[in-house]
Amino acid sequence: MKLRMDDLTWQEIDGELVILDLQGSVYLTTNAAGAFLTKLLTEERSEGELTDALIAEYRIDRETAERDVDAFVAQLKDQDLLA
């Protein structure tokens, strides 16, 4: 999966990310982990790769990382932000 780049703009503020979809008028804010995952999704990534990266970056257990990645990906899909 990969972030849909057309008509998206974002700004990082104090470690959080604000994403604006100019096409669909979608406004999304993320925490630091969401900002980290969003940046990874500028290139094609699997959920497993995102999970592994989250574990390495934040030193959390696999179950927590999988749950967080699943929730974040679901949110991006709901907002039609994935290519």
Task: Label the model's feature ranges.
Residues M1-L22:
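Long, low-complexity, charged/polar intrinsically disordered regions in eukaryotic proteins
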Residues I13, V26-A83:
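Long, charge-rich, low-complexity alpha-helical segments
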